[in-house]
Protein backbone atom coordinates (compact mmCIF):
# COMPACT_ATOMS: atom_id res chain seq x y z
CA UNK A 1 0.00 0.00 0.00
CA UNK A 2 3.00 2.33 -0.26
CA UNK A 3 2.29 5.52 -2.22
CA UNK A 4 4.84 8.16 -3.18
CA UNK A 5 4.58 11.74 -4.34
CA UNK A 6 6.83 14.72 -4.89
CA UNK A 7 5.21 18.15 -4.87
CA UNK A 8 1.99 17.40 -6.83
CA UNK A 9 3.37 14.53 -8.91
CA UNK A 10 2.22 11.16 -7.55
CA UNK A 11 3.13 7.56 -8.20
CA UNK A 12 -0.07 7.42 -10.26
CA UNK A 13 0.96 10.30 -12.55
CA UNK A 14 1.58 9.15 -16.11
CA UNK A 15 5.04 9.99 -17.51
CA UNK A 16 3.49 10.23 -20.97
CA UNK A 17 0.85 12.68 -19.72
CA UNK A 18 3.55 14.85 -18.12
CA UNK A 19 5.51 14.88 -21.39
CA UNK A 20 2.37 15.92 -23.28
CA UNK A 21 1.57 18.71 -20.81
CA UNK A 22 5.16 19.99 -20.99
CA UNK A 23 4.91 20.22 -24.79
CA UNK A 24 2.53 23.08 -25.58
CA UNK A 25 2.33 22.11 -29.27
CA UNK A 26 1.29 18.52 -28.53
CA UNK A 27 -1.16 19.64 -25.84
CA UNK A 28 -2.78 22.09 -28.22
CA UNK A 29 -3.02 19.48 -30.97
CA UNK A 30 -4.75 16.99 -28.67
CA UNK A 31 -7.20 19.59 -27.38
CA UNK A 32 -8.04 20.72 -30.92
CA UNK A 33 -8.71 17.11 -31.94
CA UNK A 34 -11.10 16.89 -28.98
CA UNK A 35 -12.91 20.08 -30.16
CA UNK A 36 -11.76 22.02 -27.09
CA UNK A 37 -11.28 25.78 -27.70
CA UNK A 38 -7.65 26.93 -27.87
CA UNK A 39 -5.94 30.10 -29.12
CA UNK A 40 -4.93 30.14 -32.81
CA UNK A 41 -1.21 30.29 -33.55
CA UNK A 42 1.87 28.37 -34.61
CA UNK A 43 5.43 27.27 -33.81
CA UNK A 44 8.48 29.40 -34.63
CA UNK A 45 12.22 28.84 -34.66
CA UNK A 46 13.26 32.01 -36.49
CA UNK A 47 12.02 35.41 -37.65
CA UNK A 48 10.71 34.00 -40.94
CA UNK A 49 8.42 31.62 -39.05
CA UNK A 50 7.39 34.47 -36.79
CA UNK A 51 6.45 36.67 -39.73
CA UNK A 52 4.39 33.87 -41.31
CA UNK A 53 2.44 33.18 -38.11
CA UNK A 54 1.72 36.88 -37.57
CA UNK A 55 0.45 37.19 -41.15
CA UNK A 56 -1.90 34.31 -40.42
CA UNK A 57 -3.30 35.38 -37.03
CA UNK A 58 -2.54 39.12 -36.81
CA UNK A 59 -1.70 41.25 -33.79
CA UNK A 60 -1.81 41.35 -30.80
CA UNK A 61 0.06 38.14 -29.99
CA UNK A 62 1.56 36.13 -27.15
CA UNK A 63 5.07 34.68 -27.48
CA UNK A 64 6.29 31.98 -25.09
CA UNK A 65 8.77 29.07 -24.94
CA UNK A 66 7.32 25.82 -26.26
CA UNK A 67 8.32 23.86 -23.16
CA UNK A 68 8.50 26.63 -20.55
CA UNK A 69 6.61 27.09 -17.29
CA UNK A 70 5.82 29.67 -14.57
CA UNK A 71 5.51 32.35 -17.25
CA UNK A 72 9.28 32.40 -17.87
CA UNK A 73 10.27 33.80 -21.24
CA UNK A 74 6.74 34.94 -22.11
CA UNK A 75 5.83 38.21 -23.83
CA UNK A 76 2.15 39.18 -23.66
CA UNK A 77 0.02 41.51 -25.79
CA UNK A 78 2.75 42.18 -28.38
CA UNK A 79 1.45 44.68 -30.96
CA UNK A 80 4.34 45.49 -33.32
CA UNK A 81 7.10 43.74 -35.24
CA UNK A 82 10.06 45.12 -33.25
CA UNK A 83 8.56 43.87 -29.99
CA UNK A 84 7.72 40.52 -31.61
CA UNK A 85 11.37 40.03 -32.66
CA UNK A 86 12.52 40.94 -29.14
CA UNK A 87 9.92 38.55 -27.67
CA UNK A 88 11.14 35.73 -29.92
CA UNK A 89 14.73 36.24 -28.77
CA UNK A 90 13.59 36.40 -25.14
CA UNK A 91 11.60 33.15 -25.39
CA UNK A 92 14.52 31.38 -27.11
CA UNK A 93 16.57 31.87 -23.95
CA UNK A 94 14.33 29.17 -22.48
CA UNK A 95 13.48 26.94 -25.46
CA UNK A 96 14.77 26.37 -29.00
CA UNK A 97 11.22 26.37 -30.33
CA UNK A 98 8.70 29.08 -29.53
CA UNK A 99 4.90 29.12 -29.64
CA UNK A 100 3.14 32.24 -30.95
CA UNK A 101 -0.59 32.64 -30.34
CA UNK A 102 -3.32 35.21 -30.75
CA UNK A 103 -3.66 37.34 -27.62
CA UNK A 104 -7.05 36.70 -26.00
CA UNK A 105 -8.52 39.39 -23.77
CA UNK A 106 -10.07 38.49 -20.45
CA UNK A 107 -9.03 37.25 -17.02
CA UNK A 108 -6.58 34.48 -16.18
CA UNK A 109 -8.14 31.49 -14.40
CA UNK A 110 -6.58 28.31 -13.02
CA UNK A 111 -8.82 25.27 -12.57
CA UNK A 112 -7.54 22.35 -10.49
CA UNK A 113 -8.71 18.85 -11.40
CA UNK A 114 -7.79 15.85 -9.23
CA UNK A 115 -8.74 12.30 -10.18
CA UNK A 116 -10.79 13.74 -13.09
CA UNK A 117 -12.97 15.83 -10.76
CA UNK A 118 -13.11 19.59 -10.16
CA UNK A 119 -11.52 20.52 -6.84
CA UNK A 120 -10.94 24.28 -7.05
CA UNK A 121 -10.80 27.28 -9.37
CA UNK A 122 -9.05 30.61 -8.92
CA UNK A 123 -8.91 33.92 -10.76
CA UNK A 124 -5.29 35.03 -10.93
CA UNK A 125 -4.00 38.59 -11.14
CA UNK A 126 -0.44 39.60 -12.10
CA UNK A 127 1.84 41.26 -9.55
CA UNK A 128 0.84 44.90 -9.18
CA UNK A 129 0.90 47.92 -6.91
CA UNK A 130 -1.76 50.56 -6.25
CA UNK A 131 -0.69 54.19 -6.30
CA UNK A 132 -1.23 56.57 -3.38
CA UNK A 133 -0.15 59.76 -5.15
CA UNK A 134 2.90 60.05 -2.89
CA UNK A 135 5.24 57.07 -3.22
CA UNK A 136 7.24 55.88 -6.22
CA UNK A 137 6.63 52.51 -7.85
CA UNK A 138 9.87 51.21 -6.30
CA UNK A 139 8.71 52.29 -2.83
CA UNK A 140 5.28 50.71 -3.39
CA UNK A 141 6.94 47.43 -4.39
CA UNK A 142 9.07 47.49 -1.25
CA UNK A 143 5.98 48.17 0.88
CA UNK A 144 4.03 45.36 -0.82
CA UNK A 145 6.90 42.95 -0.18
CA UNK A 146 6.67 43.66 3.56
CA UNK A 147 3.41 41.67 3.62
CA UNK A 148 4.17 38.75 6.00
CA UNK A 149 2.40 36.41 3.57
CA UNK A 150 5.11 37.03 0.97
CA UNK A 151 8.31 35.00 0.90
CA UNK A 152 10.96 33.82 -1.53
CA UNK A 153 10.15 31.08 -4.02
CA UNK A 154 7.44 28.85 -2.59
CA UNK A 155 8.29 29.29 1.10
CA UNK A 156 5.08 31.22 1.83
CA UNK A 157 1.56 31.62 0.44
CA UNK A 158 2.62 34.58 -1.73
CA UNK A 159 5.92 35.40 -3.44
CA UNK A 160 8.03 38.54 -3.28
CA UNK A 161 7.77 40.84 -6.31
CA UNK A 162 11.12 41.08 -8.10
CA UNK A 163 11.95 43.75 -10.65
CA UNK A 164 13.08 42.13 -13.90
CA UNK A 165 13.01 42.73 -17.65
CA UNK A 166 9.28 42.01 -17.79
CA UNK A 167 8.68 44.71 -15.16
CA UNK A 168 10.78 47.37 -16.86
CA UNK A 169 9.24 46.57 -20.27
CA UNK A 170 5.71 46.99 -18.91
CA UNK A 171 6.62 50.26 -17.20
CA UNK A 172 8.32 51.53 -20.35
CA UNK A 173 5.14 50.93 -22.37
CA UNK A 174 3.32 53.16 -19.88
CA UNK A 175 6.03 55.80 -20.07
CA UNK A 176 6.92 55.02 -16.44
CA UNK A 177 10.10 54.16 -14.52
CA UNK A 178 10.57 52.77 -11.02
CA UNK A 179 10.81 56.38 -9.82
CA UNK A 180 7.39 57.34 -11.21
CA UNK A 181 4.72 58.30 -8.64
CA UNK A 182 1.40 56.72 -9.76
CA UNK A 183 -1.87 58.57 -9.24
CA UNK A 184 -3.96 57.71 -6.18
CA UNK A 185 -5.71 54.33 -6.66
CA UNK A 186 -4.01 53.77 -10.04
CA UNK A 187 -3.17 50.07 -10.48
CA UNK A 188 0.24 49.49 -12.09
CA UNK A 189 0.89 45.94 -13.30
CA UNK A 190 4.45 44.72 -12.88
CA UNK A 191 4.30 41.34 -14.66
CA UNK A 192 2.67 40.23 -17.89
CA UNK A 193 1.69 36.82 -16.50
CA UNK A 194 -0.45 36.05 -13.45
CA UNK A 195 1.71 33.33 -11.88
CA UNK A 196 1.92 33.32 -8.08
CA UNK A 197 5.61 32.45 -8.47
CA UNK A 198 6.21 35.94 -9.90
CA UNK A 199 4.26 37.79 -7.20
CA UNK A 200 0.69 37.37 -8.46
CA UNK A 201 -2.42 37.01 -6.30
CA UNK A 202 -5.53 34.82 -6.49
CA UNK A 203 -9.27 34.94 -5.79
CA UNK A 204 -11.27 31.74 -5.26
CA UNK A 205 -14.06 31.32 -7.85
CA UNK A 206 -14.80 27.60 -7.40
CA UNK A 207 -18.49 28.09 -6.68
CA UNK A 208 -18.95 30.38 -9.70
CA UNK A 209 -18.07 27.86 -12.40
CA UNK A 210 -20.72 27.01 -14.98
CA UNK A 211 -21.46 23.23 -15.18
CA UNK A 212 -20.36 23.17 -18.84
CA UNK A 213 -16.97 24.60 -17.89
CA UNK A 214 -16.62 22.04 -15.10
CA UNK A 215 -17.37 19.25 -17.58
CA UNK A 216 -14.89 20.74 -20.07
CA UNK A 217 -12.02 20.91 -17.56
CA UNK A 218 -12.68 17.41 -16.25
CA UNK A 219 -12.67 16.18 -19.84
CA UNK A 220 -9.32 17.90 -20.47
CA UNK A 221 -7.74 15.97 -17.60
CA UNK A 222 -8.90 12.74 -19.26
CA UNK A 223 -7.73 13.80 -22.73
CA UNK A 224 -4.21 14.58 -21.45
CA UNK A 225 -4.25 11.75 -18.90
CA UNK A 226 -3.15 13.61 -15.77
CA UNK A 227 -4.28 12.55 -12.30
CA UNK A 228 -3.55 16.05 -10.94
CA UNK A 229 -4.11 18.69 -13.56
CA UNK A 230 -4.04 22.49 -13.69
CA UNK A 231 -6.03 23.99 -16.56
CA UNK A 232 -5.26 27.61 -17.49
CA UNK A 233 -8.17 29.51 -19.05
CA UNK A 234 -8.44 33.00 -20.49
CA UNK A 235 -12.03 34.28 -20.40
CA UNK A 236 -14.15 37.19 -19.23
CA UNK A 237 -15.68 34.88 -16.61
CA UNK A 238 -16.34 31.23 -15.78
CA UNK A 239 -20.03 31.75 -15.03
CA UNK A 240 -20.82 31.34 -18.75
CA UNK A 241 -19.76 28.46 -21.01
CA UNK A 242 -16.51 29.29 -22.82
CA UNK A 243 -18.23 28.78 -26.16
CA UNK A 244 -20.53 31.70 -25.31
CA UNK A 245 -18.01 34.24 -23.97
CA UNK A 246 -15.15 33.51 -26.39
CA UNK A 247 -12.83 32.06 -23.75
CA UNK A 248 -10.21 29.43 -24.52
CA UNK A 249 -7.72 27.05 -22.93
CA UNK A 250 -4.21 28.49 -22.64
CA UNK A 251 -2.27 25.60 -21.12
CA UNK A 252 -2.56 22.32 -19.26
CA UNK A 253 -0.13 21.91 -16.37
CA UNK A 254 1.37 18.85 -14.74
CA UNK A 255 2.44 19.35 -11.10
CA UNK A 256 0.18 22.41 -10.62
CA UNK A 257 0.72 24.59 -7.57
CA UNK A 258 -1.73 24.36 -4.66
CA UNK A 259 -0.93 27.66 -2.90
CA UNK A 260 -3.50 29.76 -4.73
CA UNK A 261 -6.26 27.37 -3.62
CA UNK A 262 -5.08 26.61 -0.08
CA UNK A 263 -4.62 30.28 0.79
CA UNK A 264 -6.22 32.58 -1.80
CA UNK A 265 -5.74 36.33 -1.42
CA UNK A 266 -9.55 36.59 -1.42
CA UNK A 267 -12.32 34.05 -1.10
CA UNK A 268 -12.77 30.65 0.50
CA UNK A 269 -9.66 28.50 1.10
CA UNK A 270 -9.97 25.01 -0.38
CA UNK A 271 -8.51 21.86 1.16
CA UNK A 272 -7.11 20.61 -2.13
CA UNK A 273 -4.74 18.15 -0.45
CA UNK A 274 -7.58 15.95 0.82
CA UNK A 275 -8.68 14.75 -2.67
CA UNK A 276 -5.07 13.68 -3.36
CA UNK A 277 -5.08 11.45 -0.27
CA UNK A 278 -8.54 10.13 -1.18
CA UNK A 279 -7.23 9.29 -4.65
CA UNK A 280 -4.18 7.45 -3.31
CA UNK A 281 -6.08 5.83 -0.43
CA UNK A 282 -9.74 5.54 -1.52
CA UNK A 283 -12.22 5.44 1.39
CA UNK A 284 -13.03 1.84 2.28
CA UNK A 285 -9.89 0.38 0.72
CA UNK A 286 -8.12 -2.02 3.13
CA UNK A 287 -4.85 -0.35 4.12
CA UNK A 288 -2.81 0.87 7.03
CA UNK A 289 -3.18 4.43 8.26
CA UNK A 290 -1.29 6.52 5.69
CA UNK A 291 1.92 8.15 6.89
CA UNK A 292 2.76 11.27 4.94
CA UNK A 293 6.08 13.13 4.90
CA UNK A 294 5.74 16.86 4.24
Model-predicted regions and their roles:
Residues 1-5, 20, 183-192:
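Short, composition-biased local secondary-structure segments
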Residues 2-160, 211:
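Active-site nucleotide/adenylate-binding loops and adjacent lid/helix of ATP-dependent enzymes
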Residues 22-23, 29, 287-294:
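Conserved small-residue-rich
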Residues 40-41, 63, 180, 230-232:
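A generic structural-conservation signal
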Residues 51, 85, 89, 138-142, ...:
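Generic detector of well-ordered alpha-helical segments enriched in charged/polar residues
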Residues 117, 125-132, 191-293:
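ATP-dependent carboxylate activation and anion-phosphoryl transfer catalytic cores
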Residues 140-188:
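Oxyanion-binding "anion nests"
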Amino acid sequence: NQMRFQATITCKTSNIAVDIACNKEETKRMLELASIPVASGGICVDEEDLENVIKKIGYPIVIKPLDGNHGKGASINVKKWEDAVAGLAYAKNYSRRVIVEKFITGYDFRVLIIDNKLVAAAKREPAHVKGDGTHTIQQLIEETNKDPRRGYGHENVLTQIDVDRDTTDLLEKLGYTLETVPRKDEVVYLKSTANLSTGGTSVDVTDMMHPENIFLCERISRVIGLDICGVDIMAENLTQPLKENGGCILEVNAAPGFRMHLAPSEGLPRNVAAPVIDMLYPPGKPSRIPIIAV
